[in-house]
């Protein structure tokens, strides 16, 4: 069976770690791929370098680059895997653009949605796991783990609080697609709950 499952959350929420560990557990019983945005394919990785490691840029340029990376990633990796009846686990997708560029940057969620609707051509996730933490907890984790910080990581706390507000608005408008997980807990508990949510969804 095929399923498109995305992982969302603010910086420091543990998305990458949770996705990796959940994918290892699921791989025992399912055919799947784990991937990420921006990136996932060579062209997308090049765009990732520009938007995350480069200098500050116009906010609409930023939004369009994320959408371009998303389109290439879909065409080259996600859609072929779904057509092969695989489960796709993706670290970030359209909701990141809506929360970051649409809400926190102030472009407008609907405006960024229109741009991304063109890019994704109707391919929305079947399920989105949202790892819920506060901006302060996320920042403290990044500093504690001494993680390399990209351009978005370095935004001030007010920006990251807006990102979370954006996510909450998106979840409120489309609750049927989201499963919200308290990511302030021990990582093992977060992984186990996320794994159970996905297992129940796939049954």
From Swiss-Prot:
Protein's UniProt keywords contain ATP-binding: yes
UniProtKB keywords: ATP-binding, Kinase, Nucleotide biosynthesis, Nucleotide-binding, Transferase
GO molecular function: ATP binding; dTMP kinase activity
Residues passing through the membrane, by range: none
Glycoprotein listed as a keyword: no
EC class of the enzyme, as a word: transferase
Chemical reaction(s) catalysed: dTMP + ATP = dTDP + ADP
EC number(s) per entry: 2.7.4.9
Entry's Gene Ontology cellular component terms: cytosol
Residue numbers binding ATP: 9-16
Gene Ontology terms: biological process: dTDP biosynthetic process; dTTP biosynthetic process; dUDP biosynthetic process
Protein role: Phosphorylation of dTMP to form dTDP in both de novo and salvage pathways of dTTP synthesis.
Family: Belongs to the thymidylate kinase family.
Name recorded for this polypeptide: Thymidylate kinase
Species of the source: Staphylococcus haemolyticus (strain JCSC1435)
Record gene name: tmk
């Amino acid at each position: 069976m095929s399923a498109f499952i995305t992982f969302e959350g603010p910086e420091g929420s543990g998305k990458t770690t949770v996705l990796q560990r959940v994918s290892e557990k699921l791989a025992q019983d399912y055919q799947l791929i784990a991937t990420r945005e921006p990136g996932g394919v060579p062209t997308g990785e090049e765009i990732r370098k520009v938007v995350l490691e480069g200098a500050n840029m116009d906010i609409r340029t930023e939004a369009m680059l994320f959408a371009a990376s998303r389109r290439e990633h879909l065409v080259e990796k996600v859609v072929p895997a779904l057509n092969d009846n695989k489960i796709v686990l993706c670290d970030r997708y359209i909701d990141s653009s809506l929360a970051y560029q649409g809400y926190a940057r102030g472009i407008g969620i609907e405006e960024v949605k229109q741009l991304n609707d063109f890019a994704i051509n109707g391919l929305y996730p079947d399920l989105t796991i949202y790892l819920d933490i506060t901006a302060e907890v996320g920042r403290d984790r990044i500093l504690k783990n001494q993680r390399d910080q990209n351009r978005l990581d370095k935004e001030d706390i007010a920006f990251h609080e807006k990102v979370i507000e954006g996510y909450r608005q998106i979840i409120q408008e489309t609750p049927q697609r989201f499963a919200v997980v308290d990511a302030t807990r021990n990582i093992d508990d977060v992984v186990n709950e996320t794994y159970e949510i996905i297992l129940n969804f796939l049954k």
